[in-house]
């Protein structure tokens, strides 16, 4: 067995551990996949696409958001824009928004920055989910482009939630 197939097998086994009944096993798998970093991204995206299990998908989004690899940009942006049927999905959207911030704040690629920023601005100005608006504000603060700051200034004027408005003020200070 060569090193590449060993790595694929190891990554696949870690991803499959998300189905384990014991939370410590799932947590350890998340930690290991994050440590492995970018080499896991394509397999994580494929596993996400192949599954209908929202809990499994949520674990994948958590890992992808923490890795912050641009290959996950499209998936994270899709998750941010997904309509929410329950509270757990809302949490996943917030994690995805933070992942977009990490990706955009750690690259110099203007196309990647603009794509992430556009989805985050939408998340800041559109959703009824205050937690998603909060996560978008934090991520736009990380990106810190003139467009991100302008969006925060626009949003703070219309924000009705005091916690989100406070976070926007911090982001603008």
UniProtKB/Swiss-Prot annotation:
Organism domain of life? Bacteria
Per UniProt, the keywords (alphabetical) are:
Antenna complex, Lyase, Phycobilisome
In terms of SMART domains, this protein maps to: EZ_HEAT
Keyword presence, Lyase: yes
Quote the InterPro entries the UniProt record gives: ARM-like, ARM-type_fold, PBS_lyase_HEAT
Gene Ontology molecular function, alphabetical: lyase activity; oxidoreductase activity
**Biological function:** An enzyme involved in the biosynthesis of bilin.
Into which family does the record put it? Belongs to the CpcE/RpcE/PecE family.
The protein's name in its UniProt record: Bilin biosynthesis protein PecF
């Amino acid at each position: 067995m060569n090193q590449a197939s060993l790595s694929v097998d190891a990554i696949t086994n870690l991803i499959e551990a998300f189905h384990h009944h014991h939370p410590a096993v799932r947590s350890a798998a998340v930690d290991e996949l994050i440590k492995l970093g970018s080499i896991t991204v394509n397999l994580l995206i494929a596993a996400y696409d192949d599954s209908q299990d929202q809990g499994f998908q949520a674990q994948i989004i958590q890992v992808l958001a923490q890795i912050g690899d641009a290959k996950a940009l499209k998936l994270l942006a899709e998750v941010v824009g997904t309509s929410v049927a329950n509270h757990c999905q809302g949490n996943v959207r917030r994690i995805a928004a933070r992942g977009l911030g990490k990706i955009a704040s750690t690259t110099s690629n203007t196309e990647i920055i603009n794509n992430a920023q556009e989805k985050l601005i939408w998340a800041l100005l559109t959703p009824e989910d205050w937690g998603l608006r909060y996560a978008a504000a934090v991520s736009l603060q990380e990106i810190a482009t003139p467009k991100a700051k302008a969006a925060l200034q626009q949003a703070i004027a219309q924000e009705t939630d005091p916690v989100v408005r406070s976070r926007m003020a911090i982001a603008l200070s």
